[in-house]
Amino acid sequence: MANEMKKAAPFGMKDKVGYMFGDFGNDFTFLLSSSFLMKFYTDVMGVNAAIVGMVMMIARFVDAFTDVGMGQIVDHSKPTKDGKFRPWIKRMCGPVAIASFLIYQSGLAGMPYGFKVAWLFITYILWGSIFYTSINIPYGSMASAVSADPKDRAELSTWRTIGSTLANMVIGVATPMVAYVVVDGKTVMSGSRMTIIAGVFSICAILCYIVCFKLTRERVEVPASSQKVSASAIFKSIFTNRALLGIIVAAIFVLLSQLTVMSLAGYVYPNVYGSAAAQSTASLLGTVVMLIVCAPFASKLAAKFGKKELAVASSICSALVWLVCLIWRPASVWGFVACYILANIGMGFFNTIIWAMITDVIDDAEVRSGIREDGTIYSVYSFARKLGQAFSSGLVGTLLGIIGYTEATAFDPAVTRGIFNMACIAPIIGFVCIVLALVFLYPLNKKKVEENVAALAARRNSK
C-alpha cells in the first residue's frame, strides 16, 4: 500500500476536480432532501408539517449510532490498493442513490396516512442514517489522505464547496422550474414530476461518485487503528477538546441557518410571493456569486487572516443582512432575492473553509494525544451536522404547524406572514450563535494552526 502511494502522481487538478464531484454527488440527494422533502410530504403526500419534521428529527438522532459506528469502521479498516477511504465511495454510491429515489414516490399519495408516515421514516433512515453515512464519512475523511499539506487541504475544501455550489445551482434552479405547476392561479408542486426529478438526480449522483473515485488518489498512508473506542468515550472527548466542541456547535447552527432558509424557500417563493421562477433565479444568482466571489478568494483570505477569523466576519455579515430583510419586509420578491444573495456571500465564505477547519481540528487532536483518528473525529462532526439538520427539520415542521400551515391554509395572509418571519429570524439567531461559538469556544486561530502544522511536520520528519 505504501509503495502504491509513493507511485501516485503529485497532488494536482485531477484530485481537486475529483473531490469536487464527490460533494456534487452527495448534494444531489442531500440538497434535494433539504430543500424539497418537507414541501413534497406536506403538499403532495398530505402529511402534517409537524409530523414530517418530527420524523426527520428522530431519523437524524439515529445517526448518533450510525455516524460514530461508521467512523470506527473506517478507522479500523485496512488500506487496500485503492486506498483506505476511496473504496467506500464505489461500494455505496448505488445504495444511497436508490434510497433517495424511494423517498419521493408520489404514487403512494393515496395510501393510508400511517403507511405514508412509515414510508417516510423507513426510506429516510435508509438514505440518511445508513447509506449516506457510509459514503459521506469516508469521503470527508479522505481529504487528509489525499495530501498532508494544509494548503492542499484548503484547496480541497474550496473545490468541495464548488461541487456543492454547482449541485445547488442544478437542484435549486431546475427543480422549481420543473416541479411546480399553476393550478387555479396558485403555484403548487406536482408529485409525479418530483418523482421523476428524484430519479434523474439519483442517476446523476452515481455518475458523480464514479468520477470522484476515478480522479482522486490517496497519498498519505493512514494505518488501521487497533484502538477500540466506545460511543460514550467519543462523546466524552468532545467536552475535553475545545476545538472539536467549538466546530460542532458552529456546525449545528450553520446547518440550522442554511437548511431552514433552504426548506422555507419552498414556501416563501410560491406561497408568499407567488413566484417559483424567482426561487430558480435566486438559486442561480446565489451560485454565480458563490463561484465568482467566495470560491476564488476564500482560501486566500483564510491564508492571510486565518480560517476562524474569516468565519466570524462572514457570519456577522450574514446576520446583519437578514436583520435588514426582516425590518425592511420587501414587497417585491426581488428585494428578498437581493437579501438572500448578500447573505449567501457571508455564508459562502464560511462554507468554503469549514471543511479545512475540520482537518485543523484533526491535526490539533493528534498534536495533543499523539493519535490520528480522521474517521472518528469526522464522524462526530458529521453527527453534529445531522443534529443541525434534525433541529432544522423539527423547527421548520413545528413552526409551520404553529402558524397553521396546511394545504387548505397555504395562501392565507396570516400564514404567509409567519413564513416570511421564520425565513428571516431563524438565520439571524443561527449566525449570532455561530459567532459566539467560534469566538468563545473554538481556539484554533491562525497562529495556533501554524504551530500545530509545524509540530506534526517535526514529528514525521523525526521518524
Regions found by a protein language model. Give the residues of each.
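Membrane-embedded alpha-helical bundles of multi-pass transporters/translocases
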Residues: 2-463
